Amino acid sequence: NELYELCAENEIGMVLINSNEAKRTGDDSLEKMKEKANAEGYKMPYLMDEGHLVADAFGARTTPHVFMFDKNAMLAYRGSIDDNSEDKNQVTKHYLKDAINAMSKDETIDPNITRSIGCSIKRVAQ
């Protein structure tokens, strides 16, 4: 929610998209998504990517995998939220936060690409 608030302050939209198609009957079911959104106090839309079409179109490989676009709908940042997906207390680099701050000041985002870290997106055969 801290990142959502930072985006809102800078008139940047945010949406979460769940693309784990192969786990729809378990932890990534619509009901579990609603429970997580409520428990975490999400204020942004949390959407289900049916058939992982959005993930495939963007080339997303992991959860999370960030894609941030500028006001001209150009990809401005792609990659990880930060440098530690397992322990938020061990984070030393805040990639997305830095990218949001740079974008809000019309500064160059550096780095504008980082390696996405997290669990792989669970796709189904089509």
State what each model feature region is.
Residues 25, 58, 88-92:
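Extracytoplasmic/periplasmic, Sec-exported soluble proteins
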